[in-house]
Amino acid sequence: MSDLEDSILPPLKWLFDQNPPIPENIRDWLMESGSMTLRLKKYCTCFQVQRQRECFIMRDKLKEEAEHLPKSARYWLREVILMGDNKPWLLGRTVIPQETLLHNQSLMHLGTTPLGHYLFNNDKLTRDYIHIGQQGVLWARRSRLRLRDKPLLLTELFLPDSPLYLHHK
């Protein structure tokens, strides 16, 4: 992607009033408080992270994400596709203020390691909230997490082949 304003994530509609109603099995996935990576891995024999973009961006490129993060000189952006048995399951976008990276430099060097492996093996991780959203018929979620009390924003869009939809088709 040549234009930094482009994202692998399409525009998402955030649902704050639970309308439309969220099926219970879908809600269970979207409200997962543990590692989504570990949950997804239970449904495949081959799990991969395909990196799409990793770079620093300025605040003006964040759009509405800026409302969820403190002002920073710049932000680390990581966009990936999580694959299960060679099928795209999830689009992930992580935005990390530079200050969060001070004690978490490894976040810039994950390569094909899932973000969840780093986050959920860290005893200094907390979650402020999970917002549920949609893009057409696809479900999404956005979480503000904190490492050592420093925020990062993770947005995940569950693609059609994702196991989230297995019992809902």
From Swiss-Prot:
<feature type="binding site">
    <location>
        <position position="36"/>
    </location>
    <ligand>
        <name>substrate</name>
    </ligand>
</feature>
<keyword id="KW-0963">Cytoplasm</keyword>
<protein>
    <recommendedName>
        <fullName>Probable chorismate pyruvate-lyase</fullName>
        <ecNumber>4.1.3.40</ecNumber>
    </recommendedName>
</protein>
<dbReference type="GO" id="GO:0006744">
    <property type="term" value="P:ubiquinone biosynthetic process"/>
</dbReference>
<dbReference type="InterPro" id="IPR028978">
    <property type="entry name" value="Chorismate_lyase_/UTRA_dom_sf"/>
</dbReference>
<comment type="similarity">
    <text>Belongs to the UbiC family.</text>
</comment>
<feature type="binding site">
    <location>
        <position position="156"/>
    </location>
    <ligand>
        <name>substrate</name>
    </ligand>
</feature>
<comment type="function">
    <text>Removes the pyruvyl group from chorismate, with concomitant aromatization of the ring, to provide 4-hydroxybenzoate (4HB) for the ubiquinone pathway.</text>
</comment>
<keyword id="KW-0456">Lyase</keyword>
<feature type="binding site">
    <location>
        <position position="115"/>
    </location>
    <ligand>
        <name>substrate</name>
    </ligand>
</feature>
<dbReference type="GO" id="GO:0042866">
    <property type="term" value="P:pyruvate biosynthetic process"/>
</dbReference>
<keyword id="KW-0831">Ubiquinone biosynthesis</keyword>
<comment type="pathway">
    <text>Cofactor biosynthesis; ubiquinone biosynthesis.</text>
</comment>
<dbReference type="GO" id="GO:0005829">
    <property type="term" value="C:cytosol"/>
</dbReference>
<dbReference type="Pfam" id="PF04345">
    <property type="entry name" value="Chor_lyase"/>
</dbReference>
<dbReference type="GO" id="GO:0008813">
    <property type="term" value="F:chorismate lyase activity"/>
</dbReference>
<keyword id="KW-0670">Pyruvate</keyword>
<dbReference type="InterPro" id="IPR007440">
    <property type="entry name" value="Chorismate--pyruvate_lyase"/>
</dbReference>
<feature type="binding site">
    <location>
        <position position="78"/>
    </location>
    <ligand>
        <name>substrate</name>
    </ligand>
</feature>
